Amino acid sequence: MQYAKTPYMDKLAELGVTGQMKTVADGFHPGSEVANMAVLGYDLPSVYEGRGVLEAASIGVALQPGEMAMRCNLICVEGDILKNHSSGHISTEEADELIQCLNERLGSDHVKFYTGVSYRHLLVIKGGDKRLDCTPPHDVPLHPFRPLMIKPEVPEARETADLLNELILKSQEILKDHPVNLKRMAAGKDPAN
């Protein structure tokens, strides 16, 4: 590049400005959803509801008043360790079978799973308390799994945290011997468990 003729890049360098921009408001987790919404001009304190509502919008799920939307990742836990946040980037087709199975076994009038893309899905709960401490799996690869379970931030959120943790643990039992995961493991791939 040193000897290339780059008149347009040269002009950009001559007229351009550099600097830093704070894209994450104080008190917000520095995730991509927060930064992207801030860059797009959203007033985070008044509109941010978490990743779940964005996931719902991206797959066309219309949320009703009183529903709580949560991002639902298919992850890989090996032993007691969160091996990876994406189940080895599971295909959407494989994931759809697993999400349908979870819906059949764990879904109800108050709990519904929706298929998204690859490992990224949606869980909608009627009611519930959003004041929860949820650790994004991509932030903690190779960490012990159990300490990462959902914790209530206030006593009123205990019931919601307990429900979500129960869904997580039951899903592990359901998915461990699912044909999709057995096939993935036979092929040397990580299971979505």
Question: In which residue ranges do the predicted regions lie?
Answer:
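Glycine-rich, mobile lid/loop segments that gate access to catalytic sites or pores
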Residues: 86-192
